[in-house]
Regions:
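Conserved N-terminal phosphate-binding loop of PLP-dependent enzymes in the Aspartate aminotransferase
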Residues: 1-165
């Protein structure tokens, strides 16, 4: 591995002891350092952090359409990392019955449509609680976000039908 730091952090260390005292098996790997350095350059050159904030706001706005689904209990997140919580009852936030394995059904149906989701069950005290995460690429376009939401809407309709909603 390598440590990637801003110029401010580097200058602070350089003005002090000049030593960054840390060690791991792969510390100081020149390839890892070069990759980290290039990644930071690309983030800066492409203004990708600001872009992620802007596109994250757009994603959040488009995700709001999913609140019309009877099983969508909450939508939350920051930037391009967004999560959707699925519930049996929107008012009480009672989780879906774990025996439904909703998160597995959601994952499989999404894959059939070419949509990659991170889904999980047992999010509430390790027993119940189904959720999914979206984390599109930093370079995602508005049209792609719209396509993702359209596919996700179709997937949810299909899975809701399978479980009787």
């Amino acid at each position: 591995g390598a440590a990637a730091v801003t110029a401010k952090v580097f200058d602070t260390i350089a003005k002090g002891s000049g030593v960054f005292a840390a060690g791991h098996t792969w510390s100081g790997n020149p390839v890892g350092a070069a990759v980290a350095n290039k990644t930071m350059d690309l983030l800066d050159e492409g203004n990708l952090v600001q872009r992620c904030a802007e596109m994250g706001d757009y994603l959040a706005q488009k995700l709001e359409a999913l609140r019309s689904h009877p099983i969508v209990g909450d939508i939350r997140g920051e930037g391009l990392m967004r999560g959707v919580e699925f519930v049996k009852n929107k008012e009480t936030k009672e989780p879906l019955d774990p025996a439904l394995r909703f998160w597995v059904l959601l994952h499989r149906e999404a894959q059939k449509k070419g949509l990659v989701l991170e889904t999980s069950g047992g999010c509430e005290r390790g027993q119940a609680g189904d959720m999914m995460m979206l984390g599109p690429a930093f370079i995602v376009r508005k049209k792609e976000i719209e396509d993702i939401i359209g596919l996700l809407d179709d997937v949810l309709l299909g899975v809701e039908k399978k479980i009787g909603y």
